[in-house]
Amino acid sequence: EFAKNNTKGSIVNFSSTYGCGSPIPSMYVDGEKHIGYGVSKAGVIQLTKHLSTHLAPNIRVNCVSPGGVRFEQDDDFVKRYSEHTPMKRMMNVNELNGLLNFLCSEESSYVTGENVKVDGGWTSW
């Protein structure tokens, strides 16, 4: 309905780096991260690609896949996570703002179907 009634616009979906690769089991002391999480996040990335081809040229559809965001995790988890990230830390909550502003603006008028990973290099290993 959104696409039928609009001549231009931008949709930004959210996934996760776990939609791009498997979690590291040793990071989770209470057991492995459930497979359903990664499967659902991979589905969001595929949905983004599908919608980007079906809603173009008027509606752009992109996805942002953040890595770990620092927010009330215990210090041991933050340390384990940070050891696996080239930037040696978790993301701060405001570090997606510039990217989101870009993807929602006309400055990204030719960007569609992309999954942008913002993970401090996590998926570069």
Give the positions of each predicted feature.
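Catalytic loop of short-chain dehydrogenase/reductase
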Residues: 3-4, 12-56, 68-69
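A conserved structural motif in NAD(P)-dependent oxidoreductases
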Residues: 85-96, 107
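Short, small/polar-rich loop/turn modules that mediate ligand/substrate recognition or access, typified
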Residues: 56-60, 111-113
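Short C-terminal tail/terminal secondary-structure segment
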Residues: 29-30, 101, 112-125
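Glycine/proline-rich active-site loop of Rossmann-fold NAD(P)-dependent oxidoreductases
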Residues: 7, 108-111
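A short C-terminal helix-loop "cap" of Rossmann-like NAD(P)-dependent dehydrogenase/epimerase domains
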Residues: 72-86, 90
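Conserved SDR Rossmann-fold cofactor-binding beta-strand/turn motif
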Residues: 15, 60-70, 100, 104, ...
